[in-house]
Every structure is written in C-alpha cells, then in structure tokens.
Amino acid sequence: VICDVAAPIEVDEELTFDGPAPRRNAATLTALACADRVIALGEADVIGLPRLINLAREVQSRPDLFAPETDVQYWLNRSRREAAGFTPEAKMRDNWARYMQVPLTGVIPYERKVMDRLRRNGEALLEVASRHAVVQSLEAMLEGMYAVRPGA
C-alpha cells in the first residue's frame, strides 16, 4: 500500500481537551507508524532542501514515529541548474551531507523544457526517452521501494 502524506508530522500533544479529541495529523501518524518503508521527498531548491533536512532531524529525534525496522529514504525532486548551479545533484548532496549523517538516497532531475514538451504533445517520458536521467532516477526509487530487505 502506498500512502501519500504531507508534512508536518508533529504530534498535537500540546493541545489539551476535556476528553479525547481528533488530532490534526492522526491519519498521517498512523500511516507512518504502520509503514515498513517511508520515502520522504523534498524539493531540490533553497526552500525544499532545508525543509527536508528539518524533517529528517525530526524523524531522528522521534524514534516512536516508526517501527525500528522501518526503512526511511530521503529523496530530492526537481533538481535543476537554475536553482542549484551547474552540477545540481552534486551541490544538493554536498549540502545534505554538511547537515545530515543519514544518506540522501537520491536526487531526481528536472528539465522544464522537456517536461513542457511532453505535456504539450501528450507524450510519456518513458516512451520517448526511456534512458533519460529522470526515468533512471524514478526507476532507482521504485527499485528501492520494492526491494526485499534481509529478514523481511
């Protein structure tokens, strides 16, 4: 089962009620607690990278968020030269490593002109350019999602 949830993942413990009350993020927290694999996806730019780093720090500080055997992967999406310079993937990985000890699993590139052309022509990237860097990155993500873990 794949469940798409959005940040934030904080627990509303600071809210007090006279009785049980619904929590704003109850569905998100329940889905994460039941997950055997989590892919955290952030935007590869000056806003998205710090947000993903903050999320990763929150995950590290909250061992109760997932089962101990949960595989958590961190990916950056829409990596592009306009946002990060000539070698965007290398820069994103360097910036990630500067602040985080856990590995950045992958970076998905983005080429707006190519994507715009595909949408305009009603084409799928996999059909038109099956070896494109975006396709290879998404294949790597999917392989990681469905990889069998030792002992599972």
Locate each region found by the language model.
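Short, well-ordered beta-strand core segments
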Residues: V1, V38-I39
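NTP-binding/hydrolysis catalytic cores, primarily Walker-type P-loop NTPases
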Residues: R120-A152
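G-domain G4 guanine-recognition motif of GTPases
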Residues: G42-A44, S61-R62, T70-T87, G106-V114
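Switch II (G3) loop of P-loop NTPases
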Residues: V1-A27
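An anion/phosphate-binding loop that grips the pyrophosphate of nucleotide cofactors and donors
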Residues: A35
